[in-house]
Amino acid sequence: MVKAVCVINGDAKGTVFFEQETSEAPVKVTGEVLGLAKGLHGFHVHEFGDNTNGCMSSGPHFNPRNKEHGAPTDENRHLGDLGNIQAAGDSPTAVSITDSKITLFGADSIIGRTVVVHADADDLGKGGHELSKTTGNAGARIGCGVIGIAKI
């Protein structure tokens, strides 16, 4: 069992927890984010755990296999593509994701990388915009934090 935690700061704030029983098991992602406008917001793991220049230093989506951007259910997607979270607009936004592509184990572990919450909806690579296949055209980075190992 490996557990990790991410404290998100910026215009969006919150805490997100990651838990994986074994290297073969899916990762459970839970938590809540505050400060989001009503609607969908892109939710991704970015390549670097560097927030020295705010969320912009975190680099592109974590993509060690050089795939195009896609939906969490797509075979062809960045490892860091976790889709969208749905905000009601006036209350904390719950995060509840189970993903079988990200991992907390080995060379492709997301520990030490950055979670980024975006201002707009992720079009899941299907929007036809020039950014659809790289970022999901999800807009500005409004909150982020580095994923760290948590006490079990």
UniProtKB/Swiss-Prot annotation:
Cofactor binding: number and manner: Binds 1 copper ion per subunit. Binds 1 zinc ion per subunit.
SUPFAM superfamilies: Cu,Zn superoxide dismutase-like
Source organism, top-level taxon: Eukaryota
Cofactor or coenzyme needed: Cu cation; Zn(2+)
Main location: cytoplasm
Top EC class, one word: oxidoreductase
GO cellular component terms, semicolon-separated: cytoplasm
The UniProt record lists the keyword Acetylation: no
InterPro entries, sorted: SOD-like_Cu/Zn_dom_sf (IPR036423), SOD_Cu/Zn_/chaperone (IPR024134), SOD_Cu/Zn_BS (IPR018152), SOD_Cu_Zn_dom (IPR001424)
PROSITE patterns the UniProt entry points to: SOD_CU_ZN_1, SOD_CU_ZN_2
Keyword match Cytoplasm: yes
Subcellular location: Cytoplasm
GO molecular function: copper ion binding; superoxide dismutase activity
Keywords: Antioxidant, Copper, Cytoplasm, Metal-binding, Oxidoreductase, Zinc
Reactions mediated catalytically: 2 superoxide + 2 H(+) = H2O2 + O2
EC number(s) reported in the record: 1.15.1.1
A Pfam entry, by short name: Sod_Cu
Binding, Zn(2+): 61, 69, 78, 81
Assembly with partners or alone: Homodimer.
Record family assignment: Belongs to the Cu-Zn superoxide dismutase family.
Function: Destroys radicals which are normally produced within the cells and which are toxic to biological systems.
Protein name: Superoxide dismutase [Cu-Zn]
Organism annotation: Drosophila pseudoobscura pseudoobscura (Fruit fly)
